[in-house]
């Protein structure tokens, strides 16, 4: 069995990463965040850092992921 993700798998990974991007952006747009919200940002930044490091990306635009990592860090 191959560990290489299919195009569908990659699309699902990208969609999940974009969910993290949208959540980080929404929380960082607030004037302040609760401890729980900041923890959520941190977990999602970690998720994006892991995802950006994957070597299976092809034509996907990783700019929003990198921007959210920067915004949430």
Features from the language model and the residues they span:
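Short, charge-rich amphipathic interface segments used for partner binding and complex assembly
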Residues: 26, 35-73
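Terminal, compositionally biased segments
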Residues: 1-12, 63-73
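N-terminal acidic leader/helix
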Residues: 2-35
């Amino acid at each position: 069995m191959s560990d290489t993700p299919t195009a569908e798998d990659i699309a699902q990974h990208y969609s999940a990463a974009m969910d993290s991007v949208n959540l980080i952006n929404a929380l960082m747009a607030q004037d302040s965040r609760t401890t729980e919200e900041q923890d959520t940002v941190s977990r999602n930044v970690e998720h994006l850092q892991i995802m950006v490091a994957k070597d299976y990306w092809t034509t996907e635009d990783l700019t929003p992921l990198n921007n959210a990592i920067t915004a949430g860090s």
